[in-house]
Amino acid sequence: YKRQPISEAAFSGLAVGAAMMGMRPVVEFMFWSFCYVAFDQIFNNAASIRYMSGGLINVPIVFRGPANGGTNVGATHSHTPENFAANTPGLKVICPSTPADAKGMLKSAIRDNDPVCVMENTILYNLRDEVPEEDDFTIPLGKSKVVREGNDLSIIAHGNAVHTSIPVSYTHLTLPTNTTV
């Protein structure tokens, strides 16, 4: 743990260099809205170094923080850039929807050899749910989770949207459907 000034570009660049040297830094953004001031370090450097080095250099880094859609925190604190990051080659994006997801996905992200962006919705910070106690509990990155089985319609959601999709899956106004969430 190193205290840094509030300069997303500086601490992101420092962490990318540390990751290239074998450390596994976790960078915390106060809000993901500020990732744009560290654009070059995240989207050009961290995401591309493995490819630019022909696979010789890994960048095992985690960028995490609140991506706050729907929280009424104002324009400069409410960006949800997960779609942008997910479409950047070399970056992985995770958006936990439960406390167990947060624990298991974060542990997997820290162990991953590529950059991972953890985008958390603060609406979920006070969510109470069971969390597995075993030390080796992880959730593999890149795998989806089905929270309701169905065979007529699928709702694909992430983060807090999982919780708002479940009641919607029981209400279809025109046809009776069996919905997967």
Regions found by a protein language model. Give the residues of each.
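Conserved thiamine diphosphate
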Residues: 7-10, 16-156, 160-164
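Conserved small/polar residues in nucleotide/adenosyl-binding loops
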Residues: 1-4, 171-177
